[in-house]
Regions:
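WD40-repeat beta-propeller superdomains and closely related acidic/aromatic-rich repeat-like regions
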Residues: 2-367
Length: 367
């Protein structure tokens, strides 16, 4: 899952640059905001098959989505109108992400390609072939929007330069267990680290240096000499040699808090884990979902975590306490993706029920 980019919202009825819109307003406490209320604002319909992924444009005015019908769709947030459908992928579209300037939309597919589009017009600009790779299943942009990393059904991670489409580097572990899929990737908001998770619950943190070199800071893997079973799958922290509690099967979602101090992972074992960075010391394990956790998002102030699951629910968590304070059950299929709007006041959810739902919190505006 990708880091959120914050923006200052205009006051209702004000124009950008006006005195009202530039006046100092107190920052939103998103824990209070999402505790007060959460209401469905709009449902976007038009996908003919299940939806894997959804993303807000940086200006908060457009949604991009992709799914099993092989199309990328772009929507007007305020009206729910379908703006355009982008054609080119030949298999499920698993990931969509806008660059911070909104000029480029990157999409990844099970057809083994990453496509770059004009973020405003939807015109295709580049195709990044993944050669001998398998399905592309996650994408992450560096905070400056210059580097794009992909996770796939392959054991390595590739990073491209967005502006040129040039492949910059391939990250590949050096231990005997590095033959499993690197399915999930996430750049930290400070741009220092790249995290990735595998289909067996391994967690790896990379430091991508300006020279283009990579340094493995922590390398999780199976405990050596232990039989391969779901009871022994987990991660291993090399600093102290301690084998932690198992995280069965693959990691379905990864994200960071905005200050880059905590890495959050969600897994097929139905748990969410919080780790202190950069040493991957487990802080909390959150339970409550009854299905595979597919997506995670953190509010701009780092106080609220939202999770989406195959159990058809969306859960809101107080990150400080680990308490689940709200559960949404409005989708009728697995919820595959959730994402906050740039200002943190809206949430979009994409589901296998072929709909995208838009949610708002806080006090309801007067009619």
């Amino acid at each position: 899952m990708m880091p959120e980019h914050t923006m200052t919202p205009s006051l209702p009825g004000s124009l950008p640059g006006s005195a009202a819109s530039t006046a100092q307003t107190p920052p939103t406490d998103f824990l209070d905001y999402w505790k007060l209320d959460c209401r469905e604002v709009r449902t976007f319909r038009g996908h003919s098959h299940g939806i894997w992924t959804v993303a807000f444009s940086p200006d908060g005015l457009t949604l991009a989505s992709g799914g099993a019908e092989r199309l990328v769709r772009m929507w007007d947030i305020e009206t729910g109108r379908l703006l355009r459908s982008l054609r080119g992928h030949t298999n499920d579209v698993r990931a969509v992400v806008f660059t911070p300037d909104g000029q480029t939309l990157a999409t990844g597919s099970e057809d083994r390609t990453i496509r770059l589009w004009n973020g405003k017009t939807g015109e295709p600009t580049k195709i990044l072939f993944t050669r001998y790779d398998h399905n592309v299943c996650s994408l992450s942009l560096s905070p400056d929007g210059l580097m794009l990393a992909r996770g796939s059904h392959n054991k390595d991670i590739k990073i491209w330069e967005v502006t040129t489409g040039t492949e910059l580097m391939t990250l590949l572990g050096k231990d005997e267990y590095d033959h499993h899929w690197s399915v999930c990737v996430a750049f930290s908001p400070d741009g220092i680290h790249l995290a990735h998770g595998t289909d067996i619950g391994k967690i790896k943190i990379w430091e991508v240096l300006p020279s283009g070199e990579e340094k493995v800071l922590h390398d999780g893997h199976w405990r050596r000499g232990v039989e391969d079973s779901t009871e022994t799958r987990g991660y291993y922290i090399e600093d102290d040699g301690g084998f932690q509690k198992p995280m069965d099967y693959w990691i379905g979602a990864m994200t960071f808090t905005p200050d880059a101090k905590i890495l959050i992972t969600g897994s097929r074992d139905r748990t969410i884990k919080l780790f202190d960075m950069p040493h991957l010391i487990e802080k909390k394990s959150l339970t409550g979902h009854t299905g595979w956790i597919r997506s995670l998002a953190v509010s701009p102030d780092g106080k609220v975590l939202v999770s989406a699951s195959d159990d058809q629910t969306i859960k809101f968590w107080d990150l400080a306490t680990g308490r689940n304070f709200r559960t949404l059950k409005d989708h009728t299929g697995a919820v595959r993706c959730i994402t906050f709007s740039p200002d943190g006041k809206r949430l979009a959810s994409a589901s296998w029920d072929r709909t995208i739902k838009l949610w708002e919190g806080g006090a309801k505006a007067e009619e």
